[in-house]
Swiss-Prot record:
Its EC number is 4.2.1.11. One of its GO terms (cellular component) is cell surface. GO terms for molecular function: magnesium ion binding; phosphopyruvate hydratase activity. The gene is eno. Keywords: Cytoplasm, Glycolysis, Lyase, Magnesium, Metal-binding, Secreted. It is found in: Cytoplasm; Secreted; Cell surface. InterPro entries: Enolase (IPR000941), Enolase-like_C_sf (IPR036849), Enolase-like_N (IPR029017), Enolase_C (IPR020810), Enolase_CS (IPR020809), Enolase_N (IPR020811). This is Enolase. Mg(2+) binds at residues 242, 287, 314. GO terms for biological process: glycolytic process.
Length: 430
């Protein structure tokens, strides 16, 4: 039978060498699920709370034994006897056990680990792939990868202010080809950087992290790498950016301090800058172009660029239906970044994706900078037919694990697999 007989959590390490939570769920039938929780470096002010121990003598205060104990001592006894396939009821119970708006009592890292492990155990019990369990028989869309190949900001120790510069192989015929294109461009970029005498060490998300003369130079260099790899920028491959601008926004003067360039800009000047960049380069997506609390700035950006550029809310919406509803009502952005640990349960994650789709917003399924070998987000991308996934460069096992899982899923789906390329941007006037 699919009844839960044990839930167990332990402290393990993520891709940055920091502790995170791993949860295992066991059932009477022998079905089993394991999940590992990711962690972010640049985090939104309104994200669900990730519990850290604060004991400076253990992992510099970043231990997660409190969250682990919350699973083992509080959550586990409540879940014994539950039917593992009752995801909605279990997630509801987890939310009620915590009882706070931001999951600050038990910790989103504790709650999410359980939520994901339960889903994996249920899929194991039913002997079906996770994406099919989560999404049903119509789960068949492979996502366009948003591949972070130049890292800056909080993800790298360099002078680049913009956190991520990405490529999107929209001209590929299928996911396999998209991944090949991305990998070839990645290697081409390494060659270009070497020729320029620049550093080819990689950052948290597997992309290169060189010191560059300006943020725009990153775009120029990537275009050069795309062409060197034999692809057409703007036609076969589009560019995307994650500014993560809350990281360089100064609350005291209300301006954006681009320290790498020694420039200070107002909201309106930032919008002008993005408009200039999108006119010069084939940029199809900008994430968190302005601070998470700069709603007027986001509204202006949407008015100016929203019909031709995907404007993704990450820190702005934090995978939260209340924040997203506010954005939809006020005409802010046209896309939401989906990070499971920003909200804490699979049910709430899927609610945010559904709300976005109903409003004509796209949903981009995303990793965190502190990742693990867990590939659940790959299955979520296919389960929800989201059409886009952001999970780093084709480098580092913690990133490649997601891409390899998508290759497996594409193989399993065979001729029913779909890859929509540029049509994934249904929020734009293409």
């Amino acid at each position: 039978m699919p009844y839960i007989v044990d839930v167990y959590a332990r402290e393990v390490l993520d891709s940055r060498g920091n502790p995170t939570v791993e949860v295992e769920v066991y059932t009477e039938s022998g079905a089993f699920g394991r999940a590992l929780v990711p962690s972010g470096a640049s985090t939104g002010e309104y994200e669900a709370v990730e519990l850290r121990d604060g004991d400076k003598d253990r992992y510099l205060g970043k231990g997660v034994l409190t969250a682990v104990n919350n699973v083992n001592e509080i959550i586990a006894p409540e879940l014994i006897g539950f039917d593992v396939t009752e995801q909605v009821s279990i997630d509801k119970l987890l939310i009620e056990l915590d009882g706070t708006e931001n999951k600050g009592k038990l910790g989103a890292n504790a709650i999410l680990g359980v939520s994901m492990a339960v889903a994996r155990a249920a899929a194991d019990f039913l002997q079906i792939p996770l994406y099919q369990y989560l999404g049903g028989f119509n789960s068949k869309t492979l996502p366009v990868p948003m591949m972070n190949i130049v890292n800056g900001g909080e993800h790298a120790d360099n002078n680049v202010d913009i956190q991520e510069f990405m490529i999107m192989p929209v001209g590929a015929e299928n996911f396999r080809e998209a991944l090949r294109m991305g990998a070839q461009i990645f290697h081409s970029l390494k060659s270009v950087l070497k020729e320029k005498g620049l550093n080819t060490a990689v950052g948290d998300e597997g992309g290169f992290a060189p010191n560059l003369g300006s943020n725009e130079e990153a775009l120029q260099t990537i275009v050069e790498a795309i062409e060197k790899a034999g692809f057409k920028p703007g036609e076969e491959v589009k560019l995307a950016m994650d500014a993560a601008s809350s990281e360089f926004y100064n609350k005291e003067d209300g301006k954006y301090h681009l320290a790498g360039e020694g420039v200070v800009k107002t909201s309106a000047e930032m919008v002008d800058w993005y408009e200039e960049l999108t006119s010069k380069y084939p940029i199809i997506s900008i994430e968190d172009g302005l601070d998470e609390n700069d709603w007027e700035g986001h509204k202006l950006l949407t008015e100016r660029l929203g019909s031709k550029v995907q404007l993704v809310g990450d820190d702005l919406f934090v995978t939260n239906t209340k924040k997203l509803a506010e954005g939809i009502k006020n005409g802010v952005g046209n896309s939401i970044l989906i990070k499971v640990n920003q909200i804490g349960t699979l049910t709430e994650t899927f609610d945010a994706i559904e709300m976005a789709k109903r409003a004509g917003y796209t949903a981009v399924i995303s990793h965190r900078s502190g990742e693990t070998e867990d590939s659940t987000i790959a299955d979520i991308a296919v389960a929800t037919n989201a059409g886009q996934i952001k999970t780093g460069a084709p480098s580092r096992t913690d990133r490649v694990a997601k891409y390899n899982q998508l290759l497996r899923i594409e193989d399993q789906l065979a001729e029913t697999a779909q890859y929509h390329g540029i049509q994934s941007f249904y929020n734009l006037n293409k």
